[in-house]
Structures are given as structure tokens and as C-alpha cells.
């Protein structure tokens, strides 16, 4: 799979911009704050409908404009599709081959993307919500049903929290309604847990070896953390129902649901030590890079497609050996789009085989193709 071209209108610092890419290596270079990261973000938003950098869609729209528009051609298995995304301050318009798509889950996964950017260090250093968001985004691409299940779960979670808030306000709550709600809630919770656990278990087959190849360190591991006893013979749903009963009085007092996948986490360890607490920044960066590169294998295993790899300023913090070790895991079948401020950081052979795209102030200055 590769992105053949993209058109960007009124997005961040891009007014009216279009560019084509080659199926293998593409390098976007230029000084800081010229739009390199914004272009990668535009590609990501076109595929995922949301930004990896911002939770607020309005920030994507160029100042003094009411809408942003993205359009790109994706090529896969000798076929092609045209994706379109319009972003206004109140809604999004999605199209595939000029046909409007109503459900986001029917749109996402038509362009499979893996992105690394400097702030990804927060995947290790930050709070659990960032890691849950990462899993949700990746699983939405891998499994067609995941986003629908997640949306159902979030609706049920909101309904349940609304009931619990009634206790806080001293209002009447129908306990039988809450009991029925709990059955639906725990059913969706188990589906989410199973897909997340399968995702993490599959990553574990690849990440430790990639981490060792890049960093030279052994002993890396991942763990999906949940409050459910995974060794128990009792089903996940039954255990979760029991925990909801156990925490019922506390939840009534606080007005929020205290257990479920919305509280789970993804943990990173090196030789048994929690990387968030004891890892160096370099080790944390290697962990995230290994995680992202392992995802390539998951897409190939599950979807029989190689995803598009977006690497934002990944080389500036790596020494020569680590840069070369990283590049060994990117083969010519993977379309890779890299941003850098310094071409000299890149291997000469890499540059020779790449399309070089020079960006300045949201405009194309030059483009040299192989």
C-alpha cells in the first residue's frame, strides 16, 4: 500500500498544496517550522480522520478559513482509491471514490498508517490515557469491528456514569435499569479487552527482537495491565460484573465508573524494570520505535498489506549506529515518508534512492526523484 499523491487546502500553514510520492522512500526536508510536520499530519488525518497531535479539529483549519480539505490517492493490490476529507468547525465530510461515507469505521483502514513523532515519548512517559488512545487508533485500522465496539462501549460508559451522577445529586435511580446496563457494558468491555490483549500479545512476538536490534539491549517486554485476574477460570465478564458490585458504593459516591477497559494500561519493561519509572530517555525512544516497527508485521499478518510509515524528525536524536539499525527494519516494500532538517544525518545510499522534497513556509521549493 502507498499514497500516490495528496492535495492539501487550508490545513495548518498549507493554503493550496499538492505533492506526489514514490512507493518507497520519500524525504521531506527544510528548516524548522516550515510545514514538514504539518504535511505528515495532513497525511495522517486523511487516513485516520483525526490528528495524532491535537484533540481539537478547529486547530487544523487555517486561520481565517472555515474549512480544511484533504484529498489523496491510495494504491493497494494494483487498485486505487481516492480518499477525501473535509473538516469544518462542526463536522467532517468523508468520501471514498466520491461517495460519501457516513460511518467513520467504514472509512478508517482504507489507508493504513503508522506514525512516529518526537512527542511519542509520552507513550512511555505519559499517562495511561495516551496508551489507551494509541491502542484504540491502531486497532481501529486492524479490525473492522473495533471502532464500532469501542463507540458502543463509550456510549454505555456515559449512560452508566449519568446514572451514577444521579446518586451524587440525590436523585432516584432505577437499580434494575442499571443492572441491565451493566450486562451490556461488561459484554462490550470483554470484546475490547480480547482485541487489545490479542494486539499486545502479537506485538510481543516482534517488539523485543526489534528493540534489541536497534538499541543493542535485551530483556524488553510489554504487558497489558487490567484489574481482571487473567489466570482465573471465571470469565472476564463475570469478574467485571463482580467488581462493579464491589465498587458500587464508591461509584455512587463519586459518580464515575471505576473499572473497565477505560482504566486499563499498556506497560513497557526492560529486564523487569518499568521503563516509565527507570528507563532513560534514549531507552524510552527505542521502545516506541520498536513498537511502531513491530506494527508493520501486524498489518502484514492481519491485513496482508504493508502500511505507510511516517517518521517525523526521528533521526535527530539517534547516533549513527542506531540510525542504521533502524533503517535495516524498513524495507523497500514499505512506503516511508521521513522529515528532517538535516539531510547529512541520513545515509548517502538512503538519499540516493529517495524522492527529496524541499518544503519552505508551506510551499514546495523543489522535488528530486530517483
Segments (PLM) and residue ranges:
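A conserved P-loop NTPase coupling/switch region
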Residues: 106-113, 117-183, 187, 366
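Walker B catalytic acidic pair
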Residues: 312-314
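Conserved lysine of the Walker
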Residues: 36
Amino acid at each position: 500500500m502507498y499514497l500516490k499523491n495528496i492535495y492539501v487546502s487550508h490545513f495548518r500553514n498549507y493554503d493550496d498544496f499538492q505533492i506526489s510520492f514514490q512507493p518507497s522512500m520519500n524525504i521531506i526536508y527544510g528548516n524548522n517550522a516550515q510545514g514538514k510536520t504539518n504535511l505528515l499530519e495532513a497525511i495522517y488525518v486523511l487516513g485516520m480522520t483525526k490528528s495524532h497531535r491535537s484533540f481539537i479539529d478547529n486547530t487544523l483549519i487555517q486561520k481565517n478559513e472555515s474549512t480544511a480539505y484533504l484529498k489523496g490517492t491510495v494504491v493497494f493490490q494494483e487498485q486505487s482509491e481516492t480518499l477525501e476529507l473535509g473538516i469544518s468547525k462542526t463536522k467532517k465530510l468523508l468520501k471514498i471514490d466520491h461517495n460519501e461515507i457516513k460511518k467513520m469505521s467504514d472509512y478508517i483502514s482504507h489507508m493504513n498508517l503508522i506514525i512516529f513523532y518526537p512527542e511519542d515519548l509520552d507513550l512511555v512517559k505519559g499517562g495511561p490515557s495516551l496508551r489507551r488512545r494509541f491502542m484504540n487508533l491502531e486497532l481501529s485500522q486492524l479490525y473492522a469491528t473495533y471502532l464500532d465496539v469501542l463507540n458502543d462501549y463509550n456510549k454505555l460508559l456515559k449512560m452508566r456514569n449519568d446514572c451514577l451522577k444521579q446518586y451524587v445529586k440525590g436523585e432516584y435511580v432505577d437499580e434494575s435499569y442499571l443492572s441491565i446496563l451493566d450486562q451490556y457494558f461488561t459484554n462490550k468491555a470483554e470484546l475490547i479487552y480480547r482485541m487489545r490483549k490479542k494486539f499486545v500479545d502479537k506485538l510481543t512476538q516482534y517488539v523485543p527482537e526489534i528493540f534489541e536490534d536497534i538499541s543493542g539491549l535485551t530483556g524488553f517486554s510489554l504487558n497489558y495491565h487490567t484489574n481482571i485476574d487473567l489466570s482465573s477460570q471465571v470469565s472476564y465478564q463475570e469478574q467485571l460484573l463482580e467488581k462493579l458490585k464491589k465498587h458500587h458504593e464508591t461509584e455512587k459516591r463519586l459518580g464515575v465508573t471505576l473499572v473497565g477497559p477505560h482504566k486499563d494500561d499498556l506497560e513497557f519493561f526492560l529486564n523487569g524494570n518499568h521503563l516509565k519509572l527507570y528507563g532513560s530517555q534514549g531507552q524510552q525512544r527505542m521502545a516506541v520505535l520498536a513498537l511502531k516497527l513491530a506494527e508493520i508485521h501486524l498489518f502484514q499478518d492481519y491485513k496482508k498489506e504493508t502500511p505507510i510509515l511516517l517518521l517525523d524528525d526521528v533521526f535527530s536524536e539517534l547516533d549513527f549506529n542506531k540510525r542504521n539499525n533502524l533503517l535495516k527494519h524498513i524495507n523497500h516494500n514499505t512506503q516511508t515518508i521521513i522529515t528532517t532538517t538535516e539531510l547529512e544525518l541520513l545515509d548517502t545510499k538512503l538519499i540516493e534512492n529517495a524522492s527529496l522534497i524541499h518544503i519552505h513556509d508551506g510551499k514546495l521549493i523543489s522535488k528530486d526523484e530517483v
